[in-house]
Regions:
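Membrane-embedded helix-loop-helix hairpins and adjacent transmembrane boundary segments
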Residues: 1-410
Length: 410
C-alpha cells in the first residue's frame, strides 16, 4: 500500500504540478495553486467509489465503461482517452525539455526529443508493477527537492516579508482573486478535478492494488503528499516572481533551480523534477498502451509483451511530437482534460452512483459533450467547455425521465 500510495502521488505531480503550477503562481499568485489542490478534492471523492471499482475485474477505464454501456461506448471512450492523453504525455516531455534546456543550454526541441525517448524506453522496459515500485522513490525525491527549492527561494526573496512587499495584493487573494473568479474555480474543479476522480491513469492505479484497503491507503497517502508539494511549488513560483520578474512564466521553476540553488542542490532538484515528469509520462503511456492492447486489439495475455511494448512505442512517438510542437504545458493539458471530462464525466459518475444511462444516451453524452469541450478549447471559449458538462447533465436528466415513464407504463 505504501508503494502504491507513492505511485499516484508521483503521477499527479508531473510537469503540470511543478513547472505548470509554478508558472500559474508566477502569473497570478496563490490562486494558481488550485491547479494542484483540486487533486485532493477529486481523490477524496474517489474514496467513496473504491468498493464499487474493486469489485470489477477490469484492466482499463474503457473496459469498465464497456461493461456498463456496451462495446461501442467502450471503444468511443477509449478513443477519447487516447486523443486526450497524448497531450498529457506531450506536456511531460515538453516540461523535461524546458528544464534541461535551461540547465544545459541548447534548443528545447532537441531536449524534448531526448527526454521523450528516455521516457518511452523506461516504460517499455517494465510494466505497471515496475512503475509502481519506482514511483515511491520518485515521490520522495519530488517532495524533498521541491521543499529545498522553496526554502532557498523564499530566503533569497526576503522571506514572507519580502514576498508581501514585492508582490501586488492580488497575488495573496485566495480562494478567488481578480484574475481567478469563482466561475473559473468551478470550471477547474470540473475539468481538472474530475480527472482525479474518474481519470484512466488514477483508476489504473486502483485496478493495480491488491484490495480495497490497499487502494484506500494509496489514495490517502497521495492526498497527504500532494498538499505540501502544492505549498512548496507555490512558494517557489512567488519567489521566482520577485527574483526574475521578466522571464516566461513556465521558466520560473527551472530558472530558480539554476540561478538560486548551489550546483549540487540544483542537480538534486533537477533529478527530482525529471522524476516527476517521468512518473506522469510512464503511467499515461501504460494507460494508453493498455487501452490499445486490451480494448482495441483484445490482447489480455500478460505473456505477450511485444504488442503492449509496441503500443508504448507508437503512443510515445506521437506524444513526443505533441510535446515538441505544443504551445505550453498547461494549454495542452487543459485541451486533453476538457475533451475527456466533457465527454465522459457524466456517464462515468452516473454509473458509479448506480444510475447508469441507457447505452444510446451514454454515447450521445460522450460524443456531444466531447465535441462541445473540444470546440470550446479550440475557440478559447470557456463557456462552451462548461456547456459540455451541461450537455451531459441534460442527457442524463432526459434519460431518467424516459426511464421513469417507461417503468410507469410497464
Amino acid at each position: 500500500a505504501i508503494s502504491t500510495g507513492g505511485s499516484p502521488a508521483a503521477t499527479i505531480v508531473g510537469g503540470s504540478g511543478t513547472l505548470g503550477l509554478a508558472g500559474l503562481v508566477f502569473s497570478r499568485g496563490l490562486t494558481g495553486s488550485w491547479w494542484l489542490l483540486v487533486g485532493p478534492v477529486g481523490l477524496f471523492g474517489l474514496l467513496f467509489f473504491l468498493k464499487n471499482l474493486k469489485s470489477r475485474s477490469v484492466y482499463t477505464l474503457p473496459e469498465l465503461i464497456g461493461g456498463w454501456y456496451g462495446p461501442i461506448m467502450g471503444k468511443v471512450s477509449g478513443l477519447l482517452v487516447l486523443i486526450a492523453w497524448l497531450g498529457i504525455v506531450g506536456a511531460q516531455t515538453a516540461a523535461a525539455g524546458r528544464i534541461l534546456s535551461t540547465q544545459f543550454g541548447g534548443q528545447m526541441r532537441y531536449w524534448t526529443l531526448a527526454a521523450g525517448s528516455v521516457f518511452v524506453a523506461y516504460t517499455m522496459s517494465g510494466g505497471q508493477v515496475s512503475v509502481i515500485r519506482t514511483d515511491l522513490l520518485q515521490a520522495l525525491l519530488i517532495t524533498f527537492g521541491l521543499g529545498l527549492c522553496a526554502v532557498v527561494g523564499l530566503q533569497l526573496s526576503g522571506g514572507f516579508a519580502g514576498l508581501s512587499a514585492g508582490l501586488p495584493p492580488r497575488y495573496f487573494a485566495f480562494p478567488v482573486s481578480p484574475d481567478f473568479s469563482g466561475s473559473d474555480l468551478a470550471l477547474m474543479l470540473l475539468v481538472v478535478g474530475s480527472t482525479y476522480l474518474v481519470g484512466p491513469d488514477m483508476l489504473s492505479r486502483v485496478f493495480s492494488t491488491r484490495s480495497e484497503g490497499s487502494a484506500r491507503r494509496a489514495v490517502l497517502i497521495s492526498i497527504c503528499v500532494i498538499i505540501p508539494v502544492a505549498g512548496f511549488v507555490t512558494l517557489a513560483g512567488m519567489s521566482a516572481r520577485i527574483l526574475y520578474p521578466e522571464i516566461a512564466a513556465e521558466a520560473a521553476l527551472p530558472m530558480l533551480v539554476k540561478q538560486a540553488l548551489p550546483s549540487w542542490l540544483g542537480s538534486l532538484t533537477t533529478i527530482a523534477l525529471l522524476s516527476a515528469f517521468l512518473s506522469s509520462a510512464d503511467t499515461t503511456l501504460l494507460t494508453m498502451s493498455a487501452i490499445l492492447t486490451v480494448d482495441f486489439l483484445g490482447k489480455r495475455d500478460s505473456e505477450r509483451l511485444l504488442v503492449p511494448r509496441l503500443s508504448v512505442l507508437g503512443c510515445g512517438a506521437a506524444a513526443v511530437l505533441v510535446g515538441i510542437f505544443s504551445g505550453g504545458i498547461i494549454p495542452s493539458l487543459l485541451l486533453g482534460y476538457s475533451v475527456f471530462a466533457g465527454g465522459l464525466f457524466v456517464p462515468i459518475l452516473a454509473a458509479l452512483l448506480g444510475k447508469p444511462l441507457r447505452s444510446s444516451s451514454a454515447l450521445a453524452a460522450a460524443v456531444l459533450g466531447g465535441l462541445c469541450a473540444l470546440a470550446g478549447k479550440l475557440s478559447g471559449r470557456d463557456l462552451l467547455v462548461a456547456g459540455s458538462f451541461a450537455v451531459g447533465a441534460a442527457v442524463f436528466a432526459a434519460d431518467r425521465v424516459i426511464f421513469l415513464l417507461e417503468r410507469r407504463r410497464s
